[in-house]
C-alpha cells in the first residue's frame, strides 16, 4: 500500500488532458478535418438563414456553450442555485424572448425547432431540479437533467448546419 501512495500523489499532481484546452491544437484539428471532409459529404441538413440572423443565431449558440460551462462550474462548486439561475436565464424558457427565438424559428425546419424547444424546456426542468438539489444535496437528478439538455444540443447539431 505504501508503494502506491507516491504513485497516486504523482497522478494527482499531473494535470489530465481533459482539464487542458489547447486552442492551437483544436484549430489544427479543425483545419485538418475541413481539408479532408468536403462539405458535400456533410450529411446534416443545410438551413439557410439571412446573414444577420445567422450571425445572431451563432452568437446565441456560443452563449449557450458559455452558459453550460458556467452551469458545470457552479455544480462543481456545489452552488446549485447559481446553476439553476444561469440555466433558466440563459437557456430556459425565460431565455426564448431574450434570444429572439421567435424571429430565428421562422427559418428553421420543424425538427430543428423541436430540438431547440426540447433544449429550452429541458433547461427550465434542470433549473427546477438544481434548485431542489440546493435543499436536498442530491446532485444526481440535476446531472441527469443537464445531460438531457446537452442531448438536445447534440441532436440539433448532428442533424443541422447553418449557411
Predicted regions and their residues:
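Sequence context surrounding c-type heme c attachment/ligation sites in exported
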Residues: 20-77, 81-163
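Generic leucine side-chain signal with a strong bias for well-ordered alpha-helical environments
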Residues: 10-12, 75
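Sec-dependent signal peptide recognition
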Residues: 2-9
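N-terminal signal peptide c-region/cleavage motif recognized by signal peptidases
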Residues: 13-17
Amino acid at each position: 500500500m505504501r508503494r502506491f501512495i507516491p504513485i497516486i500523489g504523482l497522478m494527482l499532481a499531473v494535470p489530465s488532458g481533459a482539464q487542458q484546452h489547447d486552442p492551437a491544437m483544436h484549430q489544427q484539428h479543425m483545419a485538418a478535418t475541413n481539408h479532408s471532409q468536403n462539405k458535400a459529404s456533410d450529411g446534416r441538413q443545410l438551413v439557410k438563414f439571412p446573414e444577420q440572423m445567422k450571425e445572431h443565431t451563432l452568437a446565441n449558440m456560443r452563449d449557450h456553450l458559455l452558459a453550460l460551462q458556467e452551469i458545470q462550474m457552479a455544480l462543481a462548486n456545489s452552488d446549485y442555485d447559481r446553476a439553476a439561475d444561469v440555466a433558466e436565464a440563459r437557456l430556459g424558457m425565460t431565455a426564448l424572448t431574450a434570444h429572439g427565438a421567435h424571429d430565428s424559428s421562422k427559418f428553421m425546419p420543424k425538427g430543428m425547432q423541436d430540438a431547440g424547444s426540447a433544449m429550452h424546456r429541458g433547461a427550465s426542468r434542470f433549473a427546477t431540479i438544481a434548485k431542489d438539489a440546493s435543499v436536498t444535496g442530491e446532485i444526481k437528478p440535476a446531472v441527469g437533467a443537464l445531460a438531457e439538455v446537452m442531448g438536445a444540443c447534440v441532436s440539433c447539431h448532428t442533424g443541422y448546419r447553418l449557411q
